[in-house]
Amino acid sequence: MSIQVFCDFDGTITNNDNIMSIMEKFAPPEAEEVKNRILSQELSIQEGVSQLFQLIPTNLHDQIIQFLIETAEIRNGFHEFIQFVNENNISFYVISGGMDFFVYPLLQGLIPKEQIYCNETDFSNEYITVNWPHPCDRLCQNHCGLCKSSLIRKLSDTNDFHIVIGDSITDLQAAKQADKVFARDFLITKCEENHISYTPFETFHDVQTELKHLLEVKL
């Protein structure tokens, strides 16, 4: 049995949700209604996020990148946590509902690209189009966009010990099949609603301390 860590990006690795930051800065007012319909699960994540990015003109690409480089903050303890998982030969994957044009630059030098799974964007037309290279498999019908539970099934064996780290509704399906969940913010609410056991965290120091204890118990 191996331990595998599947970690969200927006609002988890970063302190802020970068998609929401983009929408607040660059999207028209109607983005707020779409966002609320995603959070209430009236819209699927795939439908909602597609609609949000269709509100953003592609000629803002460089401004968006510069804005995120200046405002995105990596959560406290993440650098040390990555060093810890590498030293202990723990498999680590970023499974992000975020977009390639900002996830890759913000993680450059921290996580190898082949360990990052995110959505793709097309800037060739007037408005941003989102492509979905990691859709739901036959076991998930939630139209997740990037399906985290499907990726977990694809990247691991059933006898592996699965750890999910996340903060929002987009992490719920993955949390349902995890052996251990680290949750913060809205994911805590959803875990409690769905009777999913979780450990709250605010920094990756919290996660590392708990994971170190878990390794000692497992060994």
Swiss-Prot record:
Pfam families: HAD. Gene3D superfamilies: 3.90.1470.20, HAD superfamily/HAD-like. It catalyses: 2-hydroxy-5-methylsulfanyl-3-oxopent-1-enyl phosphate + H2O = 1,2-dihydroxy-5-(methylsulfanyl)pent-1-en-3-one + phosphate. Its EC number is 3.1.3.87. InterPro entries: HAD-like_hydrolase_phosphatase, HAD-like_sf, HAD-SF_hydro_IB_MtnX, HAD_hydro_PyrdxlP_Pase-like, HAD_sf. GO terms for molecular function: 2-hydroxy-3-keto-5-methylthiopentenyl-1-phosphate phosphatase activity. SUPFAM superfamilies: HAD-like (SSF56784). Transmembrane segments: none annotated. The keyword Ribosomal protein does not apply. It comes from the Bacteria. CDD domains: HAD_Pase (cd07524). It is an enzyme of class 3 (hydrolase). Dephosphorylates 2-hydroxy-3-keto-5-methylthiopentenyl-1-phosphate (HK-MTPenyl-1-P) yielding 1,2-dihydroxy-3-keto-5-methylthiopentene (DHK-MTPene). This is 2-hydroxy-3-keto-5-methylthiopentenyl-1-phosphate phosphatase. It comes from Bacillus cereus (strain 03BB102).
